[in-house]
Amino acid sequence: MTFDNLGEAAEIERGTWPEDQPLGQHFSVRRWLPRIVTLLARDGLRATFFAEGLNGELYPEALEALRAAGHEVACHGWRHEPWHEVADERDRLARARDALGRPVGFRPPAGRLNAGTPAILRELGYRYCSPAGSRAGRLDGLATLPFRWELIDAYYYLPHFATLRERNGDPAEPMPPAALRERVLEALEAHTAGHLTLIFHPFLMSVGDEAVSVLADVLEIAGRMDCLRMDEAAAALPDDAGPPRLDDTSWDA
């Protein structure tokens, strides 16, 4: 179980955050994060939260509370910049590492790595990455735990995922929470062994009560399964694991 994005980092990166709006009060952190933590505790789950490095400066108490509750805080870029477009990735990864308290995991915003990303991650002390893909393995020696686009809440709810939805034979228009529930529950029912990643976004709980209900239902089922934090799953990956199967598409394609 993983959660992506916290706070206003992505909106600052895109230039959509109002200049007169104070920082450090984002609803995803102040309203939804405590509720998500409560749901995880209800089902005895420990999750991984991929947070942008900026959150280490804006929400240090919230990140520390996640760790205190047994969850992992990993890196999701500095301000949610599409990673395949980043030229100064070493500087951004180092800055995020320091701001987040030296995380060991990284998930590239928009899902794609650059050719040199694995080597930089290893150099900076990261032990795994989580790009888009369908099979876990080792990429240049780095544990790689991919996610599938259709197992992300944003794939269903956000307009800019239209290209990905159409590629997969789904409607271009955003889809309701019921479609997410059906697809994720089918994947969980079919899953018997190996690695499977689910991604939810705290800010997307604002889609409505049904979005919260879907998350609650998924967590209840995950609580009956062998559900690891990502750092634990990476540590369990054999040293001689083969190459991962990655997906080179992204939501900004």
What spans do the regions from the language model cover?
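Catalytic alpha-helical scaffold of carbohydrate-active enzymes acting on polysaccharides/glycoconjugates
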Residues: 1-105, 110-152, 178-198, 206-253
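Aromatic-anchored helix/helix-loop segment that forms the rim or "lid"
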Residues: 153-189
